[in-house]
Amino acid sequence: MEKAYRIKKNADFQRIYKKGHSVANRQFVVYTCNNKEIDHFRLGISVSKKLGNAVLRNKIKRAIRENFKVHKSHILAKDIIVIARQPAKDMTTLQIQNSLEHVLKIAKVFNKKIK
């Protein structure tokens, strides 16, 4: 993803944690916060070291990023943080995609119905 679509600064993460609202399922927690300064979404991903080694954590992050790339045109202009939970480490990429889509629908991140 391009730099404009990333959240990297700790201050941005803290603002979203405090002012945003959260939705969760067993595998992911999603924090969302409106951002009027930009006209597209921004994504921050957090995968704890408790989930496994670097290879596994990066696999989870790649699957999350890929899901956002696929739905890029359907996502509202919000700041979004995705936190992976312990059960995500045993999932395939397709299962991660389905679970993430489920929690994003609950968080009302999409601007239209997704299958």
Swiss-Prot record:
Keywords (A to Z) from UniProt: Endonuclease, Hydrolase, Nuclease, RNA-binding, tRNA processing
UniProt EC number: 3.1.26.5
GO cellular component, one term: ribonuclease P complex
InterPro entries: Ribosomal_Su5_D2-typ_SF, Ribsml_uS5_D2-typ_fold_subgr, RNase_P, RNase_P_CS
A GO term for molecular function: ribonuclease P activity
Known catalytic reactions: Endonucleolytic cleavage of RNA, removing 5'-extranucleotides from tRNA precursor
Pfam families documented for this protein: Ribonuclease_P
Single Gene Ontology BP annotation: tRNA 5'-leader removal
PROSITE patterns: RIBONUCLEASE_P
Family: Belongs to the RnpA family.
Function according to Swiss-Prot or TrEMBL: RNaseP catalyzes the removal of the 5'-leader sequence from pre-tRNA to produce the mature 5'-terminus. It can also cleave other RNA substrates such as 4.5S RNA. The protein component plays an auxiliary but essential role in vivo by binding to the 5'-leader sequence and broadening the substrate specificity of the ribozyme.
Assembly description: Consists of a catalytic RNA component (M1 or rnpB) and a protein subunit.
Protein name, as recorded: Ribonuclease P protein component
Organism expressing this protein natively: Staphylococcus aureus (strain Mu3 / ATCC 700698)
